[in-house]
A protein has these predicted regions:
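Short, small-residue-biased leader/transition segments that mark boundaries at the very start
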Residues: 1-3
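Conserved PLP-enzyme active-site core in the AAT-like
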Residues: 8-30, 34-272
Length: 273
């Protein structure tokens, strides 16, 4: 943070951040923004149009707002178990494959992409399994649709895959993260969550058409492409935060704290999701 680069264009801090994001996710095209909802605004300005339908798992409020504000529709395809707050199942944030397939059968020509929120924030931060991500990818490929991850808590999602899904116990968080993102065409990120910083966000993708289409809106709404509303300090901090928070011990510390609180709530009979 102390050696940040405040250059308007071509700041070294941006390239440190870009290299970290690419190493963790595999995505080559990066657009920084000042926070997650700004990333949605920039990308959706290119992707979402009036009358579109965007299916996903319990869209976050800003995601839904950016879709509906463009006179499009956010279609919830979350599994029914997510509505039962006291039901304990490993992956209550999953997309329901049957609901998603039905949406594509009926409205394929109006669907620009499928969005998966990891973890499912609106449904209480419930995780999405790797198997479910593969199912979504297969359905998307069947209908020729891209997949976008809303990734504010992607590292926590990787943690739950490691601790709850068969075959992942011996994989590192970084390995699981890379596998998750291999099933998506792009991501938006609110960095104040799993980036463990107090400001920032970004878009990342391997689709050049998404990058080329969105970058003009970044300049219009956020700033030049190598800072996008973030200063050098914040970009340097985010590069470190993403790296540190994709380590198991760091994630487990916070999740165990939440688990402790949940056990206390159970003692007093207070429901929670």
């Amino acid at each position: 943070m102390c050696i940040r680069d405040r250059s308007y264009a071509g700041a070294s801090s941006f390239f440190k951040l870009k290299d970290t994001i690419t190493r963790l996710t595999g995505f080559e095209y990066i657009i920084p923004t000042h926070q997650g909802r700004a990333a949605e605004n920039v990308l959706f300005s290119y992707l979402v149009h009036e009358g579109d339908i965007v299916p996903g798992n319990s869209h976050f409020d800003t995601t839904k707002g950016h879709i509906e504000g463009r006179k499009a529709f956010a279609l919830d395809c979350t599994v029914d178990e997510a509505k039962q707050t006291q039901l304990e199942v490993p992956f209550k944030g999953n997309v329901d494959p049957a609901k998603l397939e039905k949406a594509l059968q009926e409205h394929a020509d109006r669907i620009p992409f499928i969005i998966v929120t990891i973890t499912n924030n609106t449904a209480g931060g419930q995780p999405v399994s790797m198997q479910n991500l593969r199912e979504v990818r297969a359905i998307a490929d069947k209908y020729g649709k891209p997949v976008l991850f809303d990734s504010a808590r992607f590292a926590e999602n990787a943690y739950f895959i490691k601790t709850r899904e068969k075959g992942y116990q011996d994989k590192t968080i970084k390995q699981i993260t890379r596998e998750m993102f291999s099933l998506a065409d792009g991501m938006t990120m609110s960095a104040k969550k799993d980036g463990i910083v107090n400001m920032g966000g970004f878009i990342a993708t391997n689709r050049k058409d998404w990058y080329e289409g969105a970058k003009g809106f970044c300049v219009q709404f956020e700033g030049y492409l190598t800072y996008g509303g973030m200063n050098g300090r914040d970009m340097n901090a985010l590069a470190i935060g993403l790296d540190e928070n994709t380590e198991f011990d760091n994630l487990e510390t916070r999740i165990r704290q939440v688990q402790y609180l949940a056990c206390k709530l159970d003692e007093y009979g207070i429901p929670y999701q």
